[in-house]
Amino acid sequence: VFNYRELAQKYDVPAWSDAQVLAEVLSRKLQQSDPLEAVGELHEEVVGTFSFVAITERGELIAARDPTGLKPLVIGSFGFDYGVIASESCAMDVIGADFKHDIEPGEAYLFTPYSIERKRFAEPNPRYCAFEYVYMARPDSIINGISVYEVRMRIGEKLAEEAAVEGADVVVGVPETAIPFAMAYANRTSTPIHMGFVRTGRRIRSAIKPTQFERLVGVQLKLNPIRRAVAGKKIVIIDDSVVRGTTTKNTVNMLRNRLGVKEVHVRIGSPRLIAPCPFGVEVPARDELIAAHLTDEEVAAVTGADTFCWLSIEGLVEAIGTPREHLCLGCFTGQHIEVAQRGMEFLKELKEAVAG
């Protein structure tokens, strides 16, 4: 929510975070309006996006998704009379609930002890986050009616079509997001796939750690290579994304120098990350993004790989199977969706007003 500080000032509430301000403003609206009407009124004042669940003082549950549907929100049932809301459908599976469907962009639901109400508070303008399918979501989820696992398998097939490595001995996927990419790539290229790394059990998003030391240690702590699977071989290593390139460089160096891998060809299951995300995903500034400044050959040289290729934007769109105009691809194109442009203009005007 780009204008959360302005909303905090208007409603005289603390501005600790956009989520906290959103909750405070919704609380004020609920004092004067029906819950579903309050969501519509909240939307009218927000410059940004949201998918949220809130509980009222009366014990009612509100779930709402903004018109872009940028982030997922799903609805399910548990038993005969319990409703369930989650950010991804896999949560329903884990607790034994039945996944029903996505909450559509611009929709809100109200759950009471006796009923469920649905209201469309704004016309849908879908701009689904493409990075959810590549990296953020779990593979056992269904998002916007599309299986994340199937998208990732199609991504692997697209990688094979666009950047196959001839004469490779082994395909290795970096656990665990890239495993479906690697499986499909190996199948399409008729190359054996091996388990090149073992997870240590630590779940660390190393790519988005704030310091280089944390990123390097994160890789060491979460992955341990299997020497017998890769030593002396020409391998294709497939990963989900590359941010700064430091963790990839560390991985390639480990494969070459510690394990004696003959050749390392890196294939990435997402397009080049060339711009930060204004919606809270921890992608660093453009200056830190290796793909924004270097060619494939230069990235290969920096990381120590023999070759280095990303999936094309067209390949990603085809793999997802959603019309391009309904996706947010801003981190790959540098052209963010309309609400982000509005938000950044708002922040610029606010900064100028404060400075003036």
PLM features: residue spans?
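PRPP-dependent phosphoribosyltransferase catalytic core
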Residues: 43, 58-60, 65, 96-98, ...
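Flexible loop/turn segments at secondary-structure boundaries
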Residues: 61, 70-71, 92-94, 117-118, ...
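Short glycine-rich phosphate-binding loop at a beta-alpha junction
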Residues: 166-177, 181, 265, 309
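Conserved short alpha-helical segments that host acidic/polar catalytic motifs at enzyme active sites
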Residues: 1-104, 110-169, 174
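Extended, hydrophobic alpha-helical segments in both membrane/secreted and soluble proteins
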Residues: 171, 178-185, 189, 193, ...
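Secondary-structure transition/capping motifs at alpha-helix termini
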Residues: 32-33, 164-169, 187-194, 229-231, ...
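Conserved hydrophobic/aromatic pocket- or pore-lining residues that grip, position, or stack substrates
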Residues: 109, 159, 171, 181, ...
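Short, glycine/charge-rich flexible loops or terminal/linker lids adjacent to PRPP-binding catalytic cores
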Residues: 190-236, 245-246, 274-284
